[in-house]
Amino acid sequence: MSDFASSTPAFTLAGRRILLGVSGSIAAYKAAPLTRLLVQAGAEVQVLLTEAASAFVTPLTLGTLSKKPVLTGFLRDAAAGEWHNHVELGLWADALLIAPASANTIGQLANGLCPNLLCAVYLSARCPVFLAPAMDLDMYAHPAVTQNLARLRSFGNHVFASPSGELASGLYGPGRMLEPEAIVAELALRLVRNEE
């Protein structure tokens, strides 16, 4: 067990059902350690991967770490007419964590758009929702993104802070996805607070 896992109040995630939504951002590679940390903390993790995210990280990687098949679309078996029920997924979860949350996904969520399974689950979820934005600093500072994040907060969603640091573009500033260890720690703390 990692030092982080042994120092984290794992009991707060033990038995928790976490939907981890991964959207298209270079930070999608951080979904792998994030998934591992959530599982180590005792959570049952179901990963939802957007088509854009699959260009950065594979379903095989996240499925291996979560010990569950990764869901990438509405259809499970098109020939048989089997589909992934977004309503059931939204009701199953104790928390919906979207990390990374790209500018595109943030805009879709803020405006009630449903182009993919992740967005449909978001609109169906009755559980607390947590978003970890990840994009370049000018995108993060753009008024459209700022307004969309404010709107998501007004819906009761928690938006993690985006720390300053070196970005994939080589620029330095805010827009980075919060590190997986910090996300798991804050998620656990907020879920406990929600129950009190």
State the predicted function of each range.
Residues 1-130, 137-196:
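A cross-family phosphate/adenosyl-ligand binding-site feature
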